[in-house]
Amino acid sequence: MSCWWKHFGDGRKLRILIARDDGEIVGIAPLMLSKYSFMRFGKLSKIEFVGSPHSDYNSFILLRKEVECLRFFLDHLIKDCSDWDYLQLRDIRENSRSGDLLCTMCDDDRPLQLERVIATLCPYIDLPDSVEAFMEGLSRNMRRNLRKRMARLRRDYDVEFRTYRDFSSVDEAMKTFFELHQKRWRSKDEEGAFSSREFRDFHLNMARVFSEKGWLSLYFLMVDDEAAAAAYTFDYKLKKYGYLTGFDPNYYPYSVGNLLKMHIVQDCVRRGLKEYDLMRDLEPYKADWASSQRRNLEVRMVRSGLFARVYDWVTKEGVPASLIQRTGVSLSRK
């Protein structure tokens, strides 16, 4: 969180709320105040989770007295903070304690005027005890295609799987990943996630920190000693989190992305991991692998102001984010 704030905190204000019971911390609300300008259309002062919109999962930290903590946080924001007009808490796992309690409050506490919406679907793979068991769970067609494409790739090239530890540094491995990710999106005439220098610098910083903690897991499929596909993942408590991928479009006929995914699953099973979380958004390349999916919730509240109500309506109606960006939305630095 501190890493994200270092790169994206400019123009925002922290609203970290702490609940104590007899002096002991029982809950933390990692929030911030962001002020957005929509050119001549209006301005919006929004309470949101630190890390939004980049974080795939957000949550309150609730150690004890969960209901009392949440009510304390919301009451404080409503009664004691007058500098915001819109609350948007994104990407809360539906099956988390925060998600359960917020759903109950949305249903029962009408005076709060909280509203929940289903924000995104998050696919994941339940990992079995053996690679053979996992392969049996795939469709016959997918198993056949994986075998055929790997055989063809090995026939045409010298193939090797590597991790970031095979590079001279974490930075070198990450820059190779950035290039593959961007190359894929440029082939579709789109920008890609790492077109922003700010976003690249953040992930370089985060990868260094995660590497030191033993959480970083960055995979590469090498073809004739050149990177053809890459996957940027994290490991934590017997779970793998798959953040982003990239591949060289020249190797698209070989399905190098799927071949690397198969290698990652095999590595997870051999290491005894229990789940491979494919994270936010159910895209086709994830759906082919997922054994199930979870939902992320979003909780909203309009506090005041006509523009806040208009913004709430527009975003609920499913107006594309790209269209909203055309209004010239920017983060106020004042």
Identify what each model region corresponds to.
Residues 1-48, 90-253:
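A conserved beta-strand-loop-helix scaffold within acyl/acetyltransferase catalytic domains
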Residues 13-14, 34-118, 234-295, 300-301:
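Acyl-donor binding region in acyl/amide transferases
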Residues 64, 127, 165, 300-303:
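Residues at the C-termini of beta-strands that transition into short coil/loop
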Residues 77, 136-144, 313-318:
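Short intrinsically disordered coil segments
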Residues 134-135, 191-192, 248-251, 266-268, ...:
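A short, structure-level motif marking secondary-structure boundaries and short turns
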Residues 225, 267, 278, 321-329:
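A general structural signal for short secondary-structure boundary/capping elements
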Residues 301-334:
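Membrane-proximal basic amphipathic "stem/tether" segments
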